[in-house]
Amino acid sequence: MRSKLLNGITSVIIVLALLSFYGWSVRKHGIPGKAQGLWGKFLVTLTSFPDLVTQAAEEVEKLPGTFVPTHPAFEPVNRLDYDINVLVSYSNEEGNRAIEVRNLKTQAVKKSWEVKGGLKPHHRIMHPLLLSNDRIAYATNGYDGIYCMNAVGEQLWHQKEIGHHPSMNAGIGETMWVCAYDLSEASHPSNGVVYEMGGVKYHFLDNYIAQLDTETGAILFKRSMAELLLDHGLEHLIIKSVVVDDPIHLNDVEPVLESSEYMLAGDVFLSFRTSSVILHYRPSNDSIIRVIEGPFTSQHDVDIVDGQTIAFFNNNAPTKRFKEDGGRNKEPNLLKYPAYSSHIKYYDFASQTFSAPNREAYSQNGVYSFTEGLFELLPNGDVLIEEQNPSLLWVFRQDSLLFKGILPSHHEGYHHLLNWTRVVD
C-alpha cells in the first residue's frame, strides 16, 4: 500500500516537473515572433493549434463578402406614394448571381435574370445595364470581360479585351460607356505604369474608358487615363493621390446625350476617386474641356442634371483609411470639427459654384459611405441614394425621408451587399 502511494506521489512530482519545464519553455522559446531553434518552433506550433482550429471554424462559418450584417436596431421606412423600379444584383441561395428589376414600394420583382458558372464567393455584378429588348450588359469583378444576355438568359456576346470596374452607362444610340481595365495582353489588370521620384520607381494601375456597340460588344473607342493625363499636362494629379499604386481609380464615365452651351453630345464626365477630381472630356477631338476640383473628396457617380449643371455623390471621405484617432489621442482637444457625412454636390457651370442642398437631412440620418455610393434624381424631384458600405437604400423628398430599406437575404441577420442600384422604367 505504502509502495503504491509513493509511486503515485512520484508520478505527480514528475508530471508537475514536466509541466513546469513545458511552461518555462513556452515562456522562454515559444512566443510567436520570438521563437528560436527547432524546439521553439515546435512549441509555437503546438500551442497555436487550438487557435488554428478556432480560426478555421470561423472561416468556415464566415459568409462571403456579398452579404452585410444587418444592424440590430435597423427599422425600415416606406412612405412611398409612387412606384420606383430599380435594377439590383445579389448572390442567391444557389450561389449564382440574380439580376432583378424590383419595385421598391411593393418589393415585387418585375423581371429577373440569372448568371451562373465561373463565380467565386466574393464576385459581384456591379452596375448592370438594362438595354433594349430586355437585354442585360453585365460583368463581375473577376476581370473576365463584359457580357450581354437576352431576356431568357442566353449569351449574346462576350467582350474579353477589357475588364469592367465599376460603372457602365448608356451612350448615344446603341452604345454604352464603361470604366475599364485593359485585358488585351493579360488576364488581369497590372501595375503597368511607372514614374520615378527621388531615385525611387513607383508602379501604378492604369484605368481606361471604353465605348462599346451594344449590339455586338465591339469596342468603338478606348483611352488610357494615364496617357490622357500625361498628354494633357495633368500628370500632377497622379502624385496628388495618397494611394500610390492606384492614384486614378476611375469610378464613373457619364456620357452627355444632349448638347448645350456648356457641353456637347458625345462628351463624357470622368470621376477619379483617389485624386478627388472630375474631368470633362471630349473624345471626338481628344480634348479636356474642364478640370473640376473643389470642396469634395473621394466622389462617385457623376450625373447630368441639366445643360449647365452636374451633380455627384460626394463621399466626403479621405481616400485612404488611417488610425481612428490620427495617432494623437493623448493631446488635448482644442477644436472640434462637425461630423463629416456623405451628400450630393451640385456644380453650376454658369456661376462655377458648388452647392449641397438637403445636406443636413442626409447628415441627420447618418448617410455615409467611405467608398462607392451613388444617387439618382427622380423625375418628380425626389432623390434616391445608395449608401453602399452598409448597403442601405434611401429616398428623400427634399429634407423628408420617404424610404429606408435593404435587400433582405436568405441568411438570418444579414442582408445583400448593394452593387450600384440603377433606377429603370
Name every feature range the model reports, one short phrase each.
Residues N7-D425:
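Histidine-/acidic-rich catalytic cores in large beta-rich domains
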